[in-house]
C-alpha cells in the first residue's frame, strides 16, 4: 500500500502529515464536546496553556494583531509541534510511510509559503489595497529592490531553519539508537523534546512578527524591528 502511494508521488512525509492532521482534528472535536462553563482538570490545563501562549504572542504582536490573528499563529505552532514530535518516535524516517514531515524540505517550504501569502493577504486587507506596499519604499525609495528581496528571503529562511534543525536531529537520534547503549539515546530524546518545542516556537514567532508588521498601521507604533 505504502509503495503504491509512493509510486504516485505521495511521500512518507505527506502520509505522516495527513495522519497528524487527522489526529489533531479528532482531538479538537473530542475537546470541543467536553467544554464546561467552569473548567476543571484537562480543560483547565489546556485553557491555561492557550492563555499563556496568547499572552506571549500579544507581547510580540500587540493586542490588536494578536487578538485578530492568534488562531492562525496558534494553529501553526500546534501543527508544527506535532510534526516535530513525530520524529521522536523510533524508526521515524526508516519505517515505510513514516517520516517526520518537518524533516522533509517540502513540508517546511509549504508552511513558509502559507506564511508568505498570509502576510500579503493580511497586509492588503489591513491597508485596503496596494497602499500596503508603500513600506517597500521606506525610508528611501532607492532601497526598494532590497526590500523586495527581503520579502522573498523570509520564506526561504523559515524553510531551511526548520528543515535543517529537525532533519539533523532525526538523523543523529537514529544513529545513536543504532550504535550506542540505551541510556544515551533516551537522554538525547529528552533534549529533542525541548528542541522540537523551540523550533515550533521560533517558526510561529517569526510568522507572528511578519504578520504583525503587515497588520501595523502608520498611526501605530512599531511592534518590532525587521528580522
Model region roles, listed by residue range:
Residues 1-227:
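Selective transmembrane helix interface/packing segments
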Amino acid at each position: 500500500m505504502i509503495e503504491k502511494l509512493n509510486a504516485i508521488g505521495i511521500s512518507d512525509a505527506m502520509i505522516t502529515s495527513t495522519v497528524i492532521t487527522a489526529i489533531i482534528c479528532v482531538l479538537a472535536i473530542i475537546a470541543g464536546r467536553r467544554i464546561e462553563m467552569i473548567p476543571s482538570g484537562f480543560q483547565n490545563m489546556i485553557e491555561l496553556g492557550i492563555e499563556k501562549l496568547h499572552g506571549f504572542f500579544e507581547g510580540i504582536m500587540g493586542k490588536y494583531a494578536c487578538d485578530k490573528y492568534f488562531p492562525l499563529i496558534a494553529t501553526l505552532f500546534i501543527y508544527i509541534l506535532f510534526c516535530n514530535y513525530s520524529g521522536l518516535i523510533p524508526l521515524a524516517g526508516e519505517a515505510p510511510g513514516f517520516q517526520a514531515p518537518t524533516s522533509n524540505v517540502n513540508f517546511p517550504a509549504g508552511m513558509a509559503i502559507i506564511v508568505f501569502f498570509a502576510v500579503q493577504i493580511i497586509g492588503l486587507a489591513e491597508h485596503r489595497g496596494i497602499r500596503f506596499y508603500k513600506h517597500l519604499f521606506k525610508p528611501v525609495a532607492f532601497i526598494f529592490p532590497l526590500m523586495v528581496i527581503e520579502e522573498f528571503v523570509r520564506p526561504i529562511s523559515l524553510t531551511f531553519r526548520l528543515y535543517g534543525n529537525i532533519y539533523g536531529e532525526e538523523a543523529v537520534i537514529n544513529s545513536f539508537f543504532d550504535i550506542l547503549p540505551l541510556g544515551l539515546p533516551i537522554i538525547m530524546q529528552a533534549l529533542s523534546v525541548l528542541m522540537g518545542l523551540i523550533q515550533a516556537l521560533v517558526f510561529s514567532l517569526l510568522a507572528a512578527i511578519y504578520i504583525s508588521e503587515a497588520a501595523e498601521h502608520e498611526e501605530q507604533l512599531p511592534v518590532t524591528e525587521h528580522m
